[in-house]
Amino acid sequence: MSLISRLRAVVAGDDYLDGDFDELDYETGDDFDTGNDGGGNYSSGLAALSNANPFNNRGGSSKVIGMPGISTAAAEVSLMEPRSFDEMPKAIQALRERKTVILNLTMMEPDQAQRAVDFVAGGTFAIDGHQERVGESIFLFAPSCVTVTNSFQEEPSPSSVMNKDNEGPVSESVMAPEPAWGASVPSAI
């Protein structure tokens, strides 16, 4: 180094004037085994990397909460026969825990049962779940991680539709409903 560059470094406040630097700010690689040929201590290197993961906040305070019940465990089905609407939050909690819920609402009054179905259907919709009517006053509600398939759809066949006039089976093309506004209004022309 020349005299002018040393003088410039002193005036500018260069800390590395003599090529020395403070090693206290840097971590050493003592965690790794330096005696290996490079590939023998792979698992301990991964363990050291996983411990240094900045996204792993096990002990820290994180504001992110997870969905309860997310795991690779077997699916669970909860059968509920509520007698009042007050028991419906239990069904929502079961859905949040990724459990499939079967509601048997035969023990409830019809207006309370309708209210219960609407409540649980709203909760199911909120978690992107599925709902299916299984039978008379029996409903299946499943979270998004469960696929619900229905192999039997209740669709009326053409032979089961009855005509009001001749009380016999008719095809669906004949049964086109007449609009309510045109049936009873006499023409004024």
UniProtKB/Swiss-Prot annotation:
- Offer a single GO CC term for the protein: cytoplasm
Where is it mostly found? cytoplasm
Swiss-Prot/TrEMBL keywords: Cell cycle, Cell division, Cytoplasm, Septation
UniProt GO BP: division septum assembly; FtsZ-dependent cytokinesis
Could you tell me which Pfam families the record lists for this protein? SepF
Decide whether keyword Nuclease is in the record: no
Q: Where is the composition biased (Polar residues)?
A: 152-163
Localization, UniProt: Cytoplasm
Q: Which residues form a coiled coil?
A: none
Q: Does the keyword Cell cycle apply?
A: yes
From the UniProt entry, list the residue stretches annotated as the region Disordered.
152-189
InterPro entries assigned: Cell_div_SepF (IPR023052), Cell_div_SepF/SepF-rel (IPR007561), SepF-like_sf (IPR038594)
**UniProt signal peptide:** none
User: Which cystines does this chain contain?
Assistant: none
Q: State the family it belongs to.
A: Belongs to the SepF family.
Q: Which HAMAP family match?
A: SepF (MF_01197)
Q: How does it assemble?
A: Homodimer. Interacts with FtsZ.
Q: What does this protein do?
A: Cell division protein that is part of the divisome complex and is recruited early to the Z-ring. Probably stimulates Z-ring formation, perhaps through the cross-linking of FtsZ protofilaments. Its function overlaps with FtsA.
Q: What is this protein called?
A: Cell division protein SepF
Q: What is the lineage of its organism?
A: Bacteria, Bacillati, Cyanobacteriota, Cyanophyceae, Synechococcales
The gene for this chain is sepF
